[in-house]
Amino acid sequence: MGYRAFALKNLARHAPKYLPFADVASEEVPLSRLLRLSLFQITVGMTLTLLAGTLNRVMIVELAVPASLVSVMLAMPMLFAPFRTLIGFKSDTHKSALGLRRAPWIWKGTIYQFGGFAIMPFALLVLSGFGESVDAPRWIGMSAAALAFLLVGAGVHIVQTAGLALATDLVAEEDQPKVVGLMYVMLLFGMVISALVYGALLADYTPGRLIQVIQGTALASVVLNMAAMWKQEAVSRDRARQMETAEHPTFKEAFGLLMGRPGMLALLTVIALGTFGFGMADVLLEPYGGQALHLTVGETTKLTALFALGTLAGFGTASRVLGNGARPMRWSAGCTDRVPGFVAIIMSSLISQDGIWLFLAGTFAVGLGIGLFGHATLTATMRTAPADRIGLALGAWGAVQATAAGLGVALAGVVRDGLVALPGTFGSGVVGPYNTVFAIEALILIVAIAFAVPLLKRGGR
């Protein structure tokens, strides 16, 4: 027990110096409790890395699944993103015999995650025609894989929306943006750590190892999410009785009130445009580095770490200035950092010397802008929403962000491939289509800034 107390004391003393947003901890809600709660973001990071990174490559290369079919499967989780607003509202108004609001929804999402991961490896092997499944009807593998990805996506959206709402319930209103920022920092950590673990486990790929890794992720998701929500919400019979008698508006009424708040529609439009531009960049940076700058697979993989470092720097900067009273909409113009970033990325393929360094600088700048933009718009959304509808506001923010990012990822590949297919437009070079897409992204971000200007003039929070 003495060692545990010593470790917790040193964690509370030193973490604020090195971990962004760690200063949100207090005597009532110590950092150890917040970090334990953030384990749900670790499982979300594991899932995102497994789907978008590891399985993306395994399905195309090792399992020889057509790339178009892989894209459809990876887009399945996006179908559930618009429902995050409803999830947030349901967790705000949930009625429980134990007086719990968020924990039941986190558990529901965990079950969805587990179910999807449990059937996913076998569905993918059937989809690829592995072994005796080569004679199975094609629709069986496609249907099972689609169901697996849809279940996992639904689980991730439910867990993240309810988990973030629970995090905001634990702290004072002025600290809510900071605690959500801390949760997103842990999401980035989860993505980086899980990428290293998955890479090591699947270094020598076999179908059996694929089954072990995916089902191990299913088990880890259950264990970590249970640890995250354990004793975070206090059981209260009195609160349960209040829940039974409390009158709540319908979802339509609550959503209408939220959208009727001054500036909310314009704010969500800015979020959609800015995140859409980010989504288009996310899917093309690594192939651009390989084809335009001739970077190796190992070198392009490190772009993820550089990108995450820039995002962390943006989150940390936004946390510091917003904590000192700065207006979030002014800092949401952090997407202006991404416009020069895209210019640097485009120029990196057009100069003969030091192009790689310019590309790396542009990648970091894009990550920095994303961190500033994401935290500032999240803070603005929470400040605009009513105090008793934080879950609904977080759901709306998450729904817009996830949907816009998914559409950006899908459209970037389509536009790039369409430009490549145009005869004689770019000659035999591979750089032109990429640079055109990056230029489109920069224009979209400029439009986002234009939509943010009226919010700045209004002088809102």
UniProtKB/Swiss-Prot annotation:
Keywords carried by this UniProt record: Antenna complex, Cell membrane, Membrane, Transmembrane, Transmembrane helix
Superkingdom classification of source: Bacteria
Pfam families: PUCC
GO CC annotation, single: light-harvesting complex
InterPro entries reported for this sequence: MFS_trans_sf (IPR036259), PucC (IPR026036), PucC-rel (IPR004896)
Cytoplasmic topological intervals: 1-36, 84-109, 164-182, 229-261, 320-338, 377-394, 457-461
Signal peptide (residue range): none
Membrane topology type: Multi-pass membrane protein
Parts of the chain on the Periplasmic side: 57-62, 130-142, 203-209, 282-302, 356-358, 416-436
Transmembrane segments: 37-56, 63-83, 110-129, 143-163, 183-202, 210-228, 262-281, 303-319, 339-355, 359-376, 395-415, 437-456
Cellular location(s): Cell membrane
PANTHER family, per database record: 44.5 KD BACTERIOCHLOROPHYLL SYNTHASE SUBUNIT
Family from the record: Belongs to the PucC family.
Cited function: PucC is required for high-level transcription of the puc operon.
Protein's name according to its UniProt entry: Protein PucC
Species the sequence originates in: Rhodobacter capsulatus (Rhodopseudomonas capsulata)
Protein encoded by which gene: pucC
